[in-house]
Curated annotation (Swiss-Prot):
Listed PROSITE patterns: ADH_SHORT
UniProt signal peptide: none
Annotated SUPFAM superfamilies: NAD(P)-binding Rossmann-fold domains
GO CC terms of this entry: endosome
Main location: other
Regions crossing the membrane: none
Pfam families the record matches: adh_short_C2
GO biological process, one term: melanin biosynthetic process
Protein name in UniProt: Hydroxynaphthalene reductase arp2
Pathway(s) of this molecule: Pigment biosynthesis; melanin biosynthesis
Length: 273
C-alpha cells in the first residue's frame, strides 16, 4: 500500500536533497514528497537507487528528478542548484545530506584522508548553502546535516567527528545570513539510524559488540539505551526535516537538533541518555 499524507504543508514547494538516492537522504526525500513537495534528488554514484526513489515519489503523485553531481567539486554544486531551478522553476527547501564516514587510526591518517572527508562533509555543505542563497525563495528553508558523533570521543573517528562539528558553527552564522531573505537555517545531528552507513559501522558504537557481531546483536545493544527501545530509521529523520521545512517551523532558526534519545557510548560502555 502506498503511504500518502492528506496534510500537504509543502504543496507547491520544490526541495533539493543532496545524497538523496539512498539511506537517510532517501527517507528525507520521500517524507518531503508525502507532504506535497516536488523533489530533486542529487546522487553521486547510486544512480539505480536514486531512480527508485524518484519512481516512489512519482507513485504518490509528486514530481521528482534525479540529478548526478559530485559535490566534492565545488563548481558542480553551483551547477546542480542551477539545474534544479531550470527544471522546476524555483527552489524553496535545501537539505544538505551528502556525507561519508571514515574510521582510521590516528597514526595512519593522511592529508588525503582529511581532504576526502572534509571536502564532502564540510566544504560541500558550506557551498550548498552558499549557492542556494542565490536562488532560494523568500521564506525558504536550509537544513544541514551534522552527526551526534561530533560530540563523542570515539577512537579513530576524529576526521568524521571534526567534519560534522563544523556544521554547528555554519548553522548559527548562516541563519543570520539567510535571515536577510526571510529564510531559516537549521541542522540535524542523527545517530543510530538504520542505513547502509549504519550497517557498516554501527558495531563501533554498540556496547559489548565487535566486528563479528550480527546486525541483530548490534541493533539490540544500541536500542537498549533508548527509552523507545528501538533504533531510528531514515523516515524518522525525514519527519524532523519535514517539520523544519514546514510553515510551522518559521520561528525555528539557527538550531541544532539531535533526534535520537541517546547520545552514544560512555567510557564504561553505557549509553548516555
Amino acid at each position: 500500500m502506498v503511504n500518502t499524507c492528506t496534510y500537504l504543508p509543502l504543496s507547491g514547494k520544490v526541495a533539493l536533497v543532496t545524497g538523496g538516492g539512498r539511506g537517510i537522504g532517501a527517507g528525507i526525500a520521500l517524507e518531503l514528497a508525502r507532504r506535497g513537495a516536488s523533489v530533486a534528488i542529487n546522487y553521486g554514484h547510486s544512480a539505480k537507487s536514486a531512480q527508485e526513489v524518484v519512481e516512489a515519489i512519482q507513485a504518490i503523485g509528486r514530481q521528482a528528478v534525479a540529478i548526478q553531481a559530485d559535490l566534492t567539486c565545488v563548481p558542480n554544486i553551483e551547477s546542480l542548484i542551477q539545474e534544479v531551478v531550470r527544471h522546476f522553476g524555483r527552489l524553496d527547501i535545501v537539505v544538505s545530506n551528502s556525507g561519508m564516514e571514515k574510521f582510521k587510526p590516528l597514526e595512519e591518517t593522511t592529508l588525503e584522508d582529511f581532504n576526502e572527508v572534509f571536502n564532502l562533509n564540510t566544504r560541500a555543505q558550506m557551498f550548498v548553502a552558499r549557492y542556494a542563497y542565490d536562488h532560494i525563495q523568500p521564506g525558504g528553508r536550509v537544513i544541514l546535516m551534522s552527526s551526534i558523533a561530533a560530540g563523542l570521543g570515539v577512537p579513530g573517528h576524529a576526521l568524521y567527528a571534526g567534519s560534522k562539528a563544523a556544521i554547528e558553527g555554519f548553522t548559527r552564522c548562516l541563519a543570520a545570513d539567510f535571515g536577510r531573505k526571510g529564510c531559516t537555517v537549521n541542522a540535524i545531528a542523527p545517530a543510530g539510524v538504520k542505513s547502509d552507513m549504519w550497517r557498516e559501522n554501527a558495531w563501533r558504537y554498540a556496547p559489548g559488540c565487535d566486528k563479528s557481531s550480527s546486525l541483530e546483536e548490534i541493533e539490540t545493544a544500541l536500542a537498549s539505551g533508548s527509552p523507545l527501545k528501538r533504533c531510528g530509521v531514515p523516515e524518522d529523520i525525514g519527519k524532523v526535516v519535514s517539520f523544519l521545512a514546514s510553515p510551522d517551523a518559521e520561528w525555528v532558526n539557527g538550531e541544532f537538533f539531535s533526534p535520537p534519545p541517546c547520545k552514544g557510548p560512555l567510557p564504561g560502555g553505557d549509553l548516555e541518555c
